[in-house]
Amino acid sequence: MITSIQGTLVSATPLQAIVEVAGFGYEVHIPVTTAERLPAAGAAVKLHTLVIYREDSQTLYGFASPAERDFFRLMIEHVTGVGPKMALSIMSRLALPSLESAIRMGDVASLAKCPGIGKKTAERLVVELRTKVGATGAAPGLATQPAAAASPGASAHRDAVAALVALGYRSADADEAVRRASLALGEAATTESLIKKALS
């Protein structure tokens, strides 16, 4: 099993990173919370990974810390109805400490705010994970150097909308949420800040 990948960051979006190792470029699916901590393109990077094997595909998921990777695995293995896409959506909305706290406290309302997560799924997260949270540890920062800011303007708006659609939003709803976020944050807002504001 591939438990980590270390190489050069070729490019990144809020939900995906391309890491080059020994001449090979690996596509790694990541949550927004990991994307925020990536270094600039061209820098060395290490992601803690989990490979999901399907009959017709192999998908690599990466995280800033082993704790985040382990929690992702915990969700997809122990919570009924939660697959990789939904788990990534949850971890994009809530950082690990907040996620663990919500589960421990039975905060169904906060969990249900995650895109694509209804009240019943939020309740299952609490019931099935409450006794398991807290064992995954802290989530330290990942970047080996300061992250490069995403380009402001139309490109950031477009990338933020695409990320929300990938998280389960309808296209029109995603565009409206990003538009409101842009009005609140200003024209210089980065893709990551637009996504966080739209999800809040």
Curated annotation (Swiss-Prot):
Region named Domain I: 1-64
Domain notes: Has three domains with a flexible linker between the domains II and III and assumes an 'L' shape. Domain III is highly mobile and contacts RuvB.
Name of protein: Holliday junction branch migration complex subunit RuvA
GO molecular function terms noted in the UniProt entry: ATP binding; four-way junction DNA binding; four-way junction helicase activity
Chain segments carrying region Domain II: 65-144
Any Pfam family the entry gives: HHH_5
Record's subunit section: Homotetramer. Forms an RuvA(8)-RuvB(12)-Holliday junction (HJ) complex. HJ DNA is sandwiched between 2 RuvA tetramers; dsDNA enters through RuvA and exits via RuvB. An RuvB hexamer assembles on each DNA strand where it exits the tetramer. Each RuvB hexamer is contacted by two RuvA subunits (via domain III) on 2 adjacent RuvB subunits; this complex drives branch migration. In the full resolvosome a probable DNA-RuvA(4)-RuvB(12)-RuvC(2) complex forms which resolves the HJ.
Family per record: Belongs to the RuvA family.
